[in-house]
Amino acid sequence: MDESHTIWIEKYRPAKLADIVGQDDIVERLSSYVKSGNLPHLLFTGSAGVGKTTAAVTLAREFFGDSWQMNFRELNASDERGIDVVRNQIKEFARTRPAGDAAFKILFLDEADALTTDAQAALRRTMESYAKTCRFILSCNYSSKIIDPIQSRCAIYRFRPLGPQAVKEEITRIAAREHLDVTPEAMDAMVYIAQGDMRKAINALQGAAILSATIEAPMVYAITSNARPEEIGELLTLSLSGDFDGAEALLTRLLRERGIAPNELINQCYRALTKRDMDRVLKVELIDALGETDFRLSEGASSDIQMEALIARFVLAGTRKR
């Protein structure tokens, strides 16, 4: 395949455990399994884009070498949430003997928290029955959604969101390989958008690179449909100063002209509020309003009405505090 058409998150996916950035403690502990030649069942938990899938794939590569693809299988539980996927695909893979001289195989089940409770119970029985021939690596965003009998059978690894420095180092490395010039402001924009998710940062870089070899902040915000932090600050200032018309005009521009998703705008407002120096009681009231609006949107309420109502609540709250 022409590398110019390759998705960068795959092109630059680490091939070794040691190449994974921002998860040094986890990498060290996983490497110790490779040295020992043995592996327990594992549960990887953490938000998206922090290296869970990469850790599973590189671990299999280092355990099995050239035969890793024959002894490793990846399934996504969100595709098939029911018990049939456990009875059929998972059990069929787990029961067969490993290829070559491998002592066991590895089955990586991504988004395991999407499995129903009954499916998880069946999975637990499968993990017990075929522990000699297959090790399971489960990945999830929320470990609380994994039943206790599975958690107790796994070594649990909590992947934290990647820090700004880790994101910057990876973006700098990729930019050098792709002959891109990334301005400091654009780098800060990608860190802001990523929120610890390396996939988001790399996708933003690739999207911007299609437009120009010189990456600047405005194009990063534009292609990712994010408001600039200063725009969010202006929206809050207008609302809290009582300027409903000004806040409404800016809200309309962000949602309709720029195409920013309402839930993304709520997330950006929340991030700005948590860092804003302001009356604590007022901050609590505003965050409560954000949470209620986010919930109503998730329930299918009209986004136009809910976002207008949110601005109205901000204006009223700011007016009461003046």
From Swiss-Prot:
InterPro entries registered for this protein in UniProt: AAA+_ATPase, ATPase_AAA_core, DNA_pol3_clamp-load_cplx_C, DNA_Rep/Repair_Clamp_Loader, P-loop_NTPase, Rep_factor-C_ssu_arc, Rep_factorC_C, RFC_lid
Residues holding ATP: 46-53
Gene Ontology molecular functions: ATP binding; ATP hydrolysis activity; DNA binding; DNA clamp loader activity
Alphabetical keyword list: ATP-binding, DNA replication, Nucleotide-binding
Pfam families in the cross-refs: AAA, AAA_lid_RFC1, Rep_fac_C
UniProt GO BP: DNA repair; DNA-templated DNA replication
Record's GO cellular component terms: DNA replication factor C complex
Physiological role: Part of the RFC clamp loader complex which loads the PCNA sliding clamp onto DNA.
UniProt record similarity statement: Belongs to the activator 1 small subunits family. RfcS subfamily.
Quaternary organization: Heteromultimer composed of small subunits (RfcS) and large subunits (RfcL).
Protein name as catalogued: Replication factor C small subunit
Organism whose genome encodes this protein: Methanoregula boonei (strain DSM 21154 / JCM 14090 / 6A8)
Gene this protein is translated from: rfcS
